[in-house]
Each structure stands twice: as C-alpha cells, then as structure tokens.
C-alpha cells in the first residue's frame, strides 16, 4: 500500500509538472492589452425578479416556475422562494443594494423591468408571459434604494405605449429594455415608427437582447436577428445590442457578424459585453475586444445575476490568465468585483468600463 501511495504521488507530481510545462508553452495571455479596472463603474444591465409577493404585480409563467431553472435563478439572486414570500419581491433589490455597497469597483446599477407580451391589437397575451416585472414596481422601488436606477420596459404593441414611455421618462427611466424573443417584438415593424420617434424625443435609448435566447421555456429566436434593428436605427434611436449578439445565426451567418456588418453604417449602434465571459459565449471575446468596428461602441454590463453561475469562472481561461490572476478572481467573493476583475484581466479596456456611465449621462 505504501509503494502504491508513493507511485500515485509521483504520478500526480509528474502530471502537474507536465501541465505546467504545457501551459508555459501554449500560454497566450489576455485577448487584448490588459490594464487595471477603474472604480466607480456603472452596471447598465442588471435584472431583478419576482412573482407577485408583496403586491409587486410581477409574474412568471407556470412552465418556468415548475422548471429547475426557477430555483436556480432565485439561488443566484441570493434569495429563496420562502424569503420572497415572507418579505416581498422587493427583497431581491435589497440584496442587490447590499452587494453593490460592498463592491470595490461598482457604484451603481440599472435595474431592468420586463414588460409582458402584447398582440398586434394591443392586447396582453396572458398565456405567453414568461416573466413580467412591471415598470411601476421597479420605477417606484429604486427611488428609495441607493445605487439603483430605473430601466423601463415598454412593449410597442401596447395601446398606451407612448404614454407609458412618457411616464417612464418622468419617473427616472434611464432607457427602455426589450427581450424581443420572449416578448414577441419585431423591431422592424413599420407601425412602431411613432414609438421610435417618441423614444428619440424623450432621449430614451433602447437596450435590447440580440441573438438567440435560451433562459426561458418559450422563445422565438427569429426576433433576435440584428438586422431587424435597421428601422429604429434609421429613426435615430440609440441602441445598445446586448451581448454583442454573441449567440445563434440567421441565413447561415452568425448573429455577431450580422451585427458587426451594421456598425459602420449606424453611429447610434452600440453593444454591451454582458455574459461575454460565459462558457457558451467566451469564444467571441478575442473578436469583440479587437474588432475595430466596435472601438468606442462597447459598454460594461453583467446581465446579473448570471455572473453568479459556474458558467462564468476564471478557471475556463488557463491559457489567458496567470495563475495569480485566476486565484485572485476565484477567491473574490463579491460577484460584481469578480466580474470586473475577470473582464479587465482578459483585456477589456478602461473605456469600456467607463462608457456605460458617460453614454447614459449619469454622474458618478
């Protein structure tokens, strides 16, 4: 037994040395020139959640609530169904406030509402609701919580869409957020022209999911095509394409390429880097951080709480990060600080961390 133990120990040591040698040979370093991240960063892509506890009006579909994803989402939000039932949906935002207060790099975040789907006649489609987080709930809650801003969500098919845009602006909305794939929004629909012109009038940018979506039980990924954004861009809406369209394809071309093709033609088209360090999207990091068409167009966001999943880990970048960087990032408890450190170490430049605040006109 002693000889066997010694043999295993030597095998482990030999394997470890071989791995270190191979890592030394194949180590590539950051995707772009790495530099220390700045402090005072704004996360412009942060979700909250709820299912109506405390009279919030929020809802999730029965299919999603029965899914394994539901309990996982609550866990990575840092709460539970029992706690939300006891304290109300607003507890999710309270958890966010506490985490932001403890962050070294993040000063504030934009909390996103999520409107329900509406049909072409302007009627709410109850059986297609995946997740609904009302504007009134988010807009009022953030007024009393330090470090939180209001990201509205207004479906353009609503009969009161223009009035809802005005209410949102009057109540502090920073921008409008869409997830077309589950809300049933075709951005290219000509009947939305007045809606887009109202957004321009109110100086409300649009943060919209672009690319495929797989976090919900029902989705129409044809609505995530970047090319559908041409109409609002032509109307003058400033658009932030979430995730740089880093998932899916249309007509045999990856969505990210379809988005990049549009960048030279529309100076009002931007993108955020949320979820780019997820295992299923990280293959695009080199392209995103080095493509000239994205220079000055990228801004920082997390898609919180997805930064709290195993899909976002420094351990997946052994040939890009030093061992010291990996250990430091893995041992960082605050999810926002962990995300900032990871993206900075991989080569995300200072101006990306700073653009979200300057673009949205928010003082630090």
Give the label of every model feature segment.
Residues 58-60, 77-86, 118-130, 215-223, ...:
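Short, flexible/disordered intra-domain loops and linkers
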Residues 47-52, 116-119, 156-160, 183, ...:
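Active-site environment of divalent metal-dependent phosphoester hydrolases
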Residues 92-100, 157-167, 256:
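Short, acidic/polar
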Residues 1-16:
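N-terminal Sec-pathway targeting helices
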Residues 108, 113-221:
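Active-site gating/metal-coordination segments in enzymes
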Residues 24-30, 245-364:
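H/E-rich (His + Asp/Glu) clusters that bind or coordinate divalent metals
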Residues 12, 19-112, 118-129, 337-340, ...:
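An N-terminally biased module of ancient metal coordination in phosphate/nucleic-acid-related enzymes
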Residues 42-46, 109-111, 149-152, 176-178, ...:
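Hydrophobic faces of well-ordered beta-strands that scaffold small-molecule active sites
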């Amino acid at each position: 037994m002693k000889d066997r133990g010694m043999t295993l120990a030597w095998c482990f040591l030999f394997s470890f040395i071989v791995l270190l040698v191979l890592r030394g040979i194949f180590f590539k370093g950051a995707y772009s020139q790495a530099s220390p991240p700045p402090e005072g960063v704004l996360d412009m892509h942060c979700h909250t959640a709820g299912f109506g506890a405390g009279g919030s009006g929020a809802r999730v579909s029965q299919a999603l609530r029965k899914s394994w994803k539901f309990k996982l989402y609550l866990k990575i939000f840092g709460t539970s169904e029992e706690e939300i039932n006891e304290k109300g949906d607003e507890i999710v935002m309270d958890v966010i406030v506490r985490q932001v207060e403890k962050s070294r790099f993040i000063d504030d975040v934009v909390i996103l509402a999520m409107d329900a789907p509406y049909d072409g006649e302007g009627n709410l489609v109850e059986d297609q609701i995946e997740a609904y987080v009302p504007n009134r709930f988010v807009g009022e809650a953030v007024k009393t919580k330090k470090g939180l801003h209001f990201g509205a969500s207004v479906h353009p098919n609503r009969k009161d869409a223009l009035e809802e845009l005005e209410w949102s602006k009057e109540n502090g909305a920073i921008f409008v957020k869409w997830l077309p794939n589950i809300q049933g929004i075709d951005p290219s629909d000509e009947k939305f022209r007045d809606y887009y012109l109202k957004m321009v009038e109110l100086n409300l940018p649009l943060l919209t999911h672009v690319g495929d979506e797989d976090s919900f039980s029902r989705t129409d990924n044809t609505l995530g095509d970047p090319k559908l954004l041409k109409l609002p861009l032509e109307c003058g809406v400033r658009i932030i394409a979430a995730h740089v369209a880093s998932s899916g394809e249309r007509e045999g071309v990856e969505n990210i390429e379809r988005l990049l093709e549009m960048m030279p033609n529309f100076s009002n088209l931007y993108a955020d880097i949320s979820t780019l360090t997820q295992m299923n999207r990280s293959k695009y990091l080199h392209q995103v951080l080095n493509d000239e068409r994205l220079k000055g167009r990228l801004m920082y966001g997390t898609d919180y709480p997805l930064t709290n999943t195993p899909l976002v880990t420094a351990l997946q970048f052994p040939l890009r990060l030093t061992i010291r960087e990996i250990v430091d990032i893995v041992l960082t408890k605050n999810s926002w600080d962990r995300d900032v450190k990871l993206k900075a170490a991989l080569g995300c430049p200072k101006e990306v961390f700073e653009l979200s605040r300057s673009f949205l006109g928010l003082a630090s």
